[in-house]
Amino acid sequence: MDSKEVLKEYFGYDSFRAGQEDIINAILEKKDVLAIMPTGAGKSLCYQVPAMMLSGITVVISPLISLMQDQVKSLNDVGINAAYVNSTLSESEIDGTLNMVLNGIYKIIYIAPERLESAKFCEFSKQADISMVTVDEAHCISQWGQDFRPSYVKIVDYINSLPARPVVSAFTATATNEVKTDIECILRLDNPKVVITGFDRKNLYYSVEHISGKNRDRYISNYVKEHIDESGIIYCATRKNVDTLYETLSSMGISVTRYHAGLSNEERKRTVSYTHLTLPTIRLV
C-alpha cells in the first residue's frame, strides 16, 4: 500500500492535511524531519502512516504516560498493533511486550525518554530492527522551553548506540526559533526536512485574567459554577495545587476527577477512561 492507501485503510481519511504528505514522503525517503504543527493538525499521522510502511519498527519517545496510553488505544482501535512500555507495567509485562515486538507482533512502541537508559531496553534495541525513532513533544529537549526534560538530551546517545542509524523524526506544537535550533542541534538531525504549518487555531478563543493568589480558588470556583453544564480541564503548577483544587470542587458537589504522577496506577487509569468519554464535550481549558 502507498501512503494514501494506508491513510484510508486504517484512519478512514481520503486526503492529507497541510504538511502531512510532505513529512510522510520525506520519512519514506529516509530523511530526518522536524515538524512544527499546531495541536489538532494531525502530527501523529505523520509518523504513524510511514511506520506502517517501513520495514522495521518505530520507537516513539513520549513524555507522558497518559499520552502513550491514548495513542496506543487509538491505534489498536483502528487495527494497528502498537504497545507501550512504562511504569504502569510489571517487569514480566515489559518482557512480554518487548518479546512481542522482536517477534513482529507490534510495529510501533511508545516509551518514556528515561526508559532509553535502562539496560533491558538497550539490549532489546540492539536486537530490534528499528527503522525510525520519533521524538514527540520535541520542545522538551530545549532549555529555552518551560517543559525542559533532561532525559530528552540523552536521546541522541540512544540513537548513536543503535547498530544502524534510523530515520529520526521530531514533532512539536510549540517552538520558538531558539527551541527549533536546539531540537535540530541536540538531536543532531541530518539535513532535516523542516515543515512548519503555523500555530494559529481559529477554533480557539484565548483570554487572560490576572488574578492574585488569594483570589484564585474563588475565581475558579465561580467560573466552574457559571459553566456547570460544560466540561473542562484545569492545569495546575503542582500536584499539591491539583489535590487542593480537586477537594475544593468536590466539596461543592461538582463532578471532578484529577490526574498527576503521585496517584496510583488504578486512579490514573480511571481518570484516563473518564476523559475519553468526556473529551468530545470539553469546551474549556
Give the positions of each predicted feature.
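Conserved pre-motif I regulatory segment
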Residues: 1-36
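Hydrophobic/aromatic ligand-binding patch that stacks against planar heteroaromatic rings
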Residues: 25, 50, 74
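Helicase motor core with emphasis on the C-terminal RecA-like subdomain
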Residues: 28-29, 34, 69, 73-277
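The conserved Walker
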Residues: 39
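Walker A/P-loop NTP-binding motif
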Residues: 44-57
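Conserved Walker A/P-loop ATP-binding site and its immediately adjacent core
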Residues: 57-75
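Single conserved hydrophobic/aromatic residue that forms the stacking wall/gate
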Residues: 276-285
